[in-house]
Amino acid sequence: MPPKAGQTKKAKMEAANKGAKKTTKKWSKGQSREALQNAVMFDKETYDKLRSEVPKYKLITPSIISDRLKIAVSIAAAGLKQLCREKLIRLVSCSSKTRVYTRIVQAAPAEAAAAAPAAE
């Protein structure tokens, strides 16, 4: 079999120039988040809400509290430490970055009655 007839240099250049040109990437304008105006100190209303509503949450982290109560994360973390000291919530997991808390579940009256005779 004879070798195929090759393209000339000129034909190769034309083929390279006309085809397979990539379009330049258009950078989309990123959607910027609005700057948060979270409070950096507890006021009476927010502190009362922290003490009444937060112990009812199933999963409690500083970032969740910050989002829901519109306070700074550092203030939320300090508030959660205080609630933990007062035994209103329980620490589940602790790392250098964040702490995870949960509510304290009260034992049902039937379970408490059954546990009392066993202790005697």
From Swiss-Prot:
GO cellular-component term (any): ribosome
Signal peptide span: none
Highest taxon above the source species: Eukaryota
Keywords of this entry: Ribonucleoprotein, Ribosomal protein
Region (Disordered): 1-32
Keyword Transmembrane: no
Ranges of biased composition (kind: Basic residues): 19-28
Short name of any one Pfam family annotated for the protein: Ribosomal_S25
Similarity field: Belongs to the eukaryotic ribosomal protein eS25 family.
The protein's name in its UniProt record: Small ribosomal subunit protein eS25
Organism: Leishmania infantum
Upper taxonomic lineage: Eukaryota, Discoba, Euglenozoa, Kinetoplastea, Metakinetoplastina
Gene: RPS25
